[in-house]
C-alpha cells in the first residue's frame, strides 16, 4: 500500500502548506506582498488602464496577461506576464502596489521560489505527465479503499469509540478503525476534488506555441476599467478578482469573480464573464 500512501502523504502535506501561502508570504516578505497605504492614497487605487500603461512602460519586453486582485485590499495585485516572442510562453508574475503604482518585485516564473516549487510538487510530484497519472491513480485507489472500509465495517457506529488496550494486536485494530472512520470523509473529499482538478486539466485544449505574444495580441484601445464597470451591470452583484487577457489562440478577455450572497461552495473566481478581444462584445 506504500505506492498509495507516499504520493498521498506528499500531496496532503504540500497542500496543507499551500493553503496558508498568503499568510506565510505576509510573514516572510511583507514589504513585497503588502501595499503601502497612507492618508494620501488610502482610497485612491489607480485604474486598471493605468496599471496596464505602467507595466507596458516599465516592463516593455513583457505582455500583461492577467491581473489578480486580492480579496484583501491591503494586499498587492499579482500581475501575470509572458515575455514577448518567448517560444515556451512561460508565465511569470510580479507584485504590483495598485495604490502607489509601484512594481514591488522582479518577474518570477510561476514555478520558481519556495511556493512555486511546492505547487509543482503538489500538482505533479516533479514528474510532469507521469506525476499527473500517478496522482490520478492514487486518488482512484484511495477512493475505493475508503468505500471498502465502509462496506467491511457497515455498523461502524456500534464500536466507534471502543479502544481496547489489553493486547497490542487488538489495540492496533481498534485504533486503525477509529482513525479510518474519522479520516475517511476528509480523504474522500481530497480524492474527489483532486480527481476533478486532474480531469479539468486533462480536458483543457492543447496549448499551441505558434501563437505570438506581442503588443498586438488584443485591441489595446479597449478600456479595462470600462469592461469592469460593464461586468457589474451585466451580472448584478459581480465583483471581479481576476482579469484574464488573451494568452493563447482563440482566447478572449475574461473576468473571473464572485456574486454577492452566492452559495458558500463558490469561491471568488466562480463566476466568469467573457468579452471579445477586438470589440468587447
Language model segments and positions:
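Conserved histidines in hydrophobic membrane contexts and catalytic metal-binding motifs
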Residues: 1-281
Amino acid at each position: 500500500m506504500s505506492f498509495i500512501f507516499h504520493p498521498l502523504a506528499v500531496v496532503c502535506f504540500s497542500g496543507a502548506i499551500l493553503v496558508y501561502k498568503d499568510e506565510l508570504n505576509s510573514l516572510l516578505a511583507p514589504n513585497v506582498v503588502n501595499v503601502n497605504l497612507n492618508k494620501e492614497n488610502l482610497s485612491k487605487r489607480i485604474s486598471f488602464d493605468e496599471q496596464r500603461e505602467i507595466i507596458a512602460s516599465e516592463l516593455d519586453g513583457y505582455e500583461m496577461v492577467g491581473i489578480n486582485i486580492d480579496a484583501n485590499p491591503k494586499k498587492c495585485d499579482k500581475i501575470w506576464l509572458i515575455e514577448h516572442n518567448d517560444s515556451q510562453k512561460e508565465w511569470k508574475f510580479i507584485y504590483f502596489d495598485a495604490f502607489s503604482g509601484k512594481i514591488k518585485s522582479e518577474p518570477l516564473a510561476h514555478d520558481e521560489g519556495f511556493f512555486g516549487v511546492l505547487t509543482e510538487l503538489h500538482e505533479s510530484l516533479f514528474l510532469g505527465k507521469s506525476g499527473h497519472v500517478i496522482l490520478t491513480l492514487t486518488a482512484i485507489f484511495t477512493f475505493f479503499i475508503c468505500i471498502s472500509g465502509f462496506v467491511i465495517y457497515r455498523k461502524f457506529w456500534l464500536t466507534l469509540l471502543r479502544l481496547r488496550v489489553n493486547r497490542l494486536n487488538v489495540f492496533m485494530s481498534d485504533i486503525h478503525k477509529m482513525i479510518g472512520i474519522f479520516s475517511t470523509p476528509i480523504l474522500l473529499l481530497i480524492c474527489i476534488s483532486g480527481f476533478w482538478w486532474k480531469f479539468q486539466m486533462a480536458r483543457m485544449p492543447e496549448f499551441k506555441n505558434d501563437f505570438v505574444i506581442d503588443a498586438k495580441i488584443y485591441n489595446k484601445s479597449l478600456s479595462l476599467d470600462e469592461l469592469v464597470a460593464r461586468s457589474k451591470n451585466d451580472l448584478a452583484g459581480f465583483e471581479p478578482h481576476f482579469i484574464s487577457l488573451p494568452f493563447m489562440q482563440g482566447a478572449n478577455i475574461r473576468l473571473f469573480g464572485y456574486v454577492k450572497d452566492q452559495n458558500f461552495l463558490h469561491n471568488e473566481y466562480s463566476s466568469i464573464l467573457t468579452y471579445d478581444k477586438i470589440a468587447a462584445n
